[in-house]
Amino acid sequence: MNYIKPLFNKNNIKIYFKIHANRLNFDVKNISTSFLHDVKNCHQKFGICGNCKYKIAQDYKNMFDQVIYIGDGLTDRCVADLADVLYVKSESNLEQYCRENNIKYTSFASFLDLYKMFEEEKRNALSWG
């Protein structure tokens, strides 16, 4: 189960993009995690994270003009300086890392904040059209 989609659904936010995340597997007695994008020999200095976000972001950089990244944790550090636009959860490990390394980002407190920011960007883009 992708645990991000229910968060968006709870806030009535439609998803128009692919989500790359680990999966939570539930059975009667246990919860386990499936790592779908694990890279054993990751070249980043942060160690194995189970979901090589750097590789995914690099793949997108090769396909598109701009990479927009949303993160909050330690495993998001490797993408922080690769993303063209970076949204960082306020008071998170990633925000601390970005401050310490002078990486430009936009802070958000909740997914609802992001939704409002994206809606504003969409309105601005349409007004130029």
Predicted features and spans:
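C-terminal cap/substrate-recognition subdomain and adjoining C-terminal extension
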Residues: 1-129
